[in-house]
UniProtKB/Swiss-Prot annotation:
Description of how the protein assembles with itself and partners: Homodimer.
Catalytic activity: deamido-NAD(+) + NH4(+) + ATP = AMP + diphosphate + NAD(+) + H(+)
Binding-site positions, Mg(2+): D52, E165
Protein's gene: nadE
Matching InterPro entries: NAD/GMP_synthase, NAD_synthase, NH(3)-dep_NAD(+)_synth, Rossmann-like_a/b/a_fold
Protein name: NH(3)-dependent NAD(+) synthetase
Binding site for deamido-NAD(+): R140, K173, D180, H260, K261
CDD domains, per database record: NAD_synthase
Pathway stated in the Swiss-Prot or TrEMBL entry: Cofactor biosynthesis; NAD(+) biosynthesis; NAD(+) from deamido-NAD(+) (ammonia route): step 1/1
Gene Ontology MF term list: ATP binding; glutaminase activity; metal ion binding; NAD+ synthase (glutamine-hydrolyzing) activity; NAD+ synthase activity
SUPFAM superfamilies registered for this protein in UniProt: Adenine nucleotide alpha hydrolases-like (SSF52402)
Organism from which the protein derives: Escherichia coli O1:K1 / APEC
Keyword annotations of the record: ATP-binding, Ligase, Magnesium, Metal-binding, NAD, Nucleotide-binding
């Protein structure tokens, strides 16, 4: 088995999907989890205005709507969380995503004050954050806020990780990577677009250039620039297609060096890092 085949198997990626079937699969997955643990009353998700959170948010709200109707349990809710750092550059996209999702509840937590306070506390301890590390600080502050909200609403935090993100480890460890449940896991980027199109999402929300937008020195840096490969390249690779040798090397290098991000904390029983 080639490394490409191993990666595809591990991530559960498929070369082709039926959008309606995958929508149903994700909704039923969320509903099943909530029904298994009836003490869970809310799904909590940060909404950025990008493709992934828009899709995950819509699926969460659909799952909650169905469960309320089927069980009569009106205490169930989906909470969409706005998490700007100061003023969000693509604010209108975020508003459009909220309008599309129609969440039960919308909360806004501006993380800038908390990030600056943390940065100052570290500075006083003699640690000056680089712009890149400050970006990770933002991602972790966003997740901290979501877990606080989940804790106060008997909720779980929903993630947006999918195969095209997991393969490159393109997320912050214990930031956007630190979630409870990931309904998009298995899909690649273009497949996520297929689901949004089937759901009637405004096209500009899934046709925009994806960006983590964490760095102050490089605002709105496209993911594809940071990764050195395009999402079309990554999706082709995940679908088992032949890609240029350099592209395959880049993707596989990202996969191998970020393996620790896809695993629980390393213990004495782990040996993947020795290979």
């Amino acid at each position: 088995m080639t490394l490409q085949q191993q990666i595809i198997k591990v991530l559960g990626a498929k070369p082709q999907i039926n959008a309606e079937e995958e929508i149903r699969r994700s909704i039923d997955f969320l509903k099943s989890y909530l029904q298994t643990y009836p003490f869970i009353k809310s799904l909590v998700l940060g909404i950025s205005g990008g493709q992934d959170s828009t899709l995950a948010g819509k699926l969460c709200q659909m799952a909650i709507n169905e469960l309320r109707q089927e069980t009569g349990n009106e205490s169930l809710q989906f909470i969409a969380v706005r998490l700007p750092y100061g003023v969000q550059a693509d604010e209108q996209d975020c508003q459009d995503a909220i309008a599309f999702i129609q969440p039960d509840r919308v909360l806004t937590v501006n993380i800038k004050g908390a990030v600056l306070a943390s940065e100052q506390a570290l500075r006083e301890a003699g640690i000056e954050l680089s712009d890149f590390v400050r970006g990770n600080e933002k991602a972790r502050e966003r997740m901290k806020a979501q877990y606080s909200i989940a804790g106060m609403t008997s909720g779980v935090v929903v993630g947006t990780d999918h195969a095209a993100e997991a393969i490159t480890g393109f997320f912050t460890k214990y930031g956007d990577g630190g979630t409870d449940i990931n309904p998009l896991y298995r899909l690649n980027k273009r497949q996520g677009k297929q689901l949004l199109a089937a759901l009637g999402c405004p096209e500009h929300l899934y046709k925009k250039a994806p960006t983590a937008d964490l760095e102050d020195d490089r605002p709105s840096l496209p993911d594809e620039v940071a990764l050195g490969v395009t999402y079309d390249n990554i999706d082709d690779y995940l679908e088992g297609k032949n890609v240029p040798e350099q592209v395959a090397r880049t993707i596989e290098n990202w996969y191998l060096k970020t393996e620790h991000k896809r695993r629980p904390p390393i213990t004495v029983f782990d040996d993947f890092w020795k290979k």
